[in-house]
UniProtKB/Swiss-Prot annotation:
SUPFAM superfamilies per UniProt: Actin depolymerizing proteins
GO molecular function list: actin filament binding; phosphatidylinositol-4,5-bisphosphate binding
Taxonomic lineage of the native organism: Eukaryota, Metazoa, Ecdysozoa, Arthropoda, Hexapoda
Protein name per the record: Actin depolymerising venom protein gelsolin 1
Family matches, as InterPro entries: ADF-H/Gelsolin-like_dom_sf, Gelsolin-like_dom, Villin/Gelsolin
Tissue expr: Expressed by the venom gland (posterior main gland) (at protein level).
Record's subcellular location: Secreted
Assigned keywords, A-Z: Repeat, Secreted, Signal
Amino acid sequence: MFRQMKLGSLATKLLLACFLVTCTSGLDIHPNLIGAGQKEGIEIWRIETFVPVPVPKSEYGKFHEGDSYIVLSTKEDKSKKGIFTWDIYYWLGKSTTQDESGTAAVLTVELDDALGKTPVQHREIQGQESEQFVKLFPGGVKYLPGGIDSGFKHTDTNAPGQKKLYQVKGAKYIRVRQVELSAKSLNNGDCFILDTGSEVYVWVGKNSQLPERLKATKAANQIKELDHRGRGKVFIVDASSTSREVKEFFTKLGSGSPSEVANTSEDDQEYEKKQDAMVTLYKVSDASGKLVTEKLSEKPLKQSMLKSEDCFVLDTVTSGVFVWIGRNSSIQEKIEAFKKGLAFLKDNKHPTWTQMQRIVDGGEPTAFKEYFLSWKN
């Protein structure tokens, strides 16, 4: 989905635009975003040659696959009139250009700053939208061919998605990771999820642990509800399944048979050690006068390593990329952290479904805290 982003010239253009706006209006935000988020509802902008162009309400829910969009959801506190909370989504079509996706990310930071740095930011990928995003459009999300910078390309928006196979494994922290779509990836010591694009199958290894089985079932239902929008079914393939049901699983997988499945798997604790070793924390700072990204090699990771004056990027490999925004960080640091997060998705060969989450200083979710030793709230 993401290509290497050539954001040097892009960032320059955007920051210059911010400077000009600041000089003429006193506001560090694009003119088309001024006044956004002051009433309940949603507002949408389509990125056109580095500019956020408002989308007519009659077109809400329709997204061109060749473009990028910013969607702002505003909710008013029922008990305190005039007090709002916000969610900012930047939606990326499967054929969007690198300039458009980069502009959407940068303008999202601008909008976040304009709203007091309190909004929650979400990255949405065409075909992998979150349930929260889809619920914004009662009539559903519709994909339209083409885009501002792309030619017309006909696509079947109802076509089944690509098949994917996931391994569910772990002792203390259960992880879900995509593996090769092959019977050779299976073993009886773990659980696996086969997403055919229309149906979801859970292979329960006879020697797998109960937490792995529970996690696999939960993840499979999330794939059905979020990725398939509630369509299709979840099938469990375990020791109680009939030979016909097992055969159906391998037919959907495309190869193999039960006799080819290995009985043993890598030790869960050793597996977790390897996964933890791949986790990397980067600091993005301009304290020296220059914008520098530094890899922090100290392990284990500690909460004290996160400084409010800077931004950080945590690449967990299996659980996605987290961009941590220090409450006192500069706009340049925020933009660079976003750029690095997006670059890691490509450079580290993450699947397109991998999530990149923006984490607010002081509002860290449990999934993020798990990577740090003795986190204190």
